[in-house]
Amino acid sequence: IRNATLLVTPDVTCGMEQVYWSIPDMYVEPVTFKASQNVSNYPVIGVELMPQRPRSFYNAQAVYSQMIQENTNQTMVFNRFPDNQIFLRPPESTITSISENVPTQTDHGTLPIRNSVSGVQRVTLTDARRRASPYVYKSIAVAQPKVLSSRTF
């Protein structure tokens, strides 16, 4: 299926979409996010650029392209983070890039963990429209515990 799938990424920066990391069962929500069990509203603990390399671009302003986007895109495109002003973005442009996936590894730093952690954890990657990202084939999050102060005992 990878040989026959064409990935297109409409974005105002011509392919520099972002990936939002959410691990709702393990980490405490950042101050500007509320706890949620809805994928489109998961609290975001890390942001990075989508691991893609744009190769070619085209203008998706044709009526057919607009009709497809109206019928398939979610309505929360323009305000995905109503409680976090940093993540507000303008509407998408008509420039679309055809991109290739590239492997990536990131470190999101030290994050506060919940007091009670269950055995199974969800790792969710969402794209700039807060959908579960179809562009990433495999993802894994590794947590390395660290005690920062005696207050945590």
Curated annotation (Swiss-Prot):
Keywords: Capsid protein, Host nucleus, Host-virus interaction, Late protein, T=25 icosahedral capsid protein, Viral attachment to host cell, Viral penetration into host cytoplasm, Virion, Virus endocytosis by host, Virus entry into host cell. One of its GO terms (biological process) is virion attachment to host cell. It is found in: Virion; Host nucleus. GO terms for cellular component: host cell nucleus; T=25 icosahedral viral capsid. It holds the Pfam family Adeno_Penton_B. Induction: Expressed in the late phase of the viral replicative cycle. All late proteins expressed from the major late promoter are produced by alternative splicing and alternative polyadenylation of the same gene giving rise to non-overlapping ORFs. A leader sequence is present in the N-terminus of all these mRNAs and is recognized by the viral shutoff protein to provide expression although conventional translation via ribosome scanning from the cap has been shut off in the host cell. Major capsid protein that self-associates to form penton base pentamers, each in the shape of a pentagon, situated at the 12 vertices of the pseudo T=25 capsid. Involved in virus secondary attachment to host cell after initial attachment by the fiber protein, and in endocytosis of virions. As the virus enters the host cell, penton proteins are shed concomitant with virion acidification in the endosome. Interacts with the fiber protein (via N-terminal tail region). Interacts with the capsid vertex protein; this interaction binds the penton base to neighboring peripentonal hexons. Belongs to the adenoviridae penton family. This is Penton protein. It comes from Bovine adenovirus 2 (BAdV-2).
